[in-house]
Amino acid sequence: MQDSQYYRENKNLWFDDSSAFTLENLKEKVVSATKECGLFLWRSGKCLTKENLLELSNTLGTALNQSAQGCEVFEVKDEGYEKTDPRFRGPSSNRQLTFHTDRCDLLLFHCIRQASEGGVNLFVHSETIYSILEEESPELLKVLEENFLYKRHNADPANPLSYYELPVFGDKKERVITLMTWLIEQAHQDSELPNLSELQLKSLVKIQEICQRKEVHLEVSLKPGDLLFLNNLQMLHSRTAFEASGDRLYYRVWLAVPWSVELPDSFEELFGATAAGAVRGGFKKF
């Protein structure tokens, strides 16, 4: 099971604070670590500009749009928007986030400034979640392998679909996972769409409860210059709330990578392509 104990015992697999990387061996390490244990953290000690970060990212894969305007390097910081503001997005707030996935194969965070208090990153491997559900709640695991309705994201106006359907666990062999609870909740609140069943509601609560367990998730406090690469198809991530002082700033890149696995057909509406190694994910440009 890939739990927090596993990450403590195998830190050499996913962590490196060496300055001896070249682009070639960095890529090799990222591919190996994200396949093996889902993430790789490099303490580079150097903050990159957006341009340099994008150059590095493009040696690994294809940077994807993270907004309708075509943003490829997204600033994760507290913008002070209220939740009712149409510009509101979870990463643009200082709130604690639920465990979730994004819209890419590989997710890259680059820490520019850490919060004075809070803002700790949390990670859980899908294998861990699956195993616990198999043992504790097999009836809910079955529900999570069926489709949930998702409302279109407010940052995705170019998408012609107002909603789409997707399972949380989409592939048993690869343990592919996708979860964006807030879009499921928005679909649930839409009077024109069917409500979630009682079992679906219970399954969403259960998966968050599992991820919140101290013995399950890995906690990582990023430092300025850190580069964290995450297998977005096998890892859920979250972060704790942080002081709304305006200090915390991460750069985020979504990547489609050539070593990605084939996705189930049900993922086509969200990712646009399902073939292994395809350029897929992100938002359509408006």
Predicted regions and their residues:
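Active-site environment of non-heme Fe oxygenases that use a 2-His-1-carboxylate facial triad
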Residues: 1-22, 28, 35, 70-224, ...
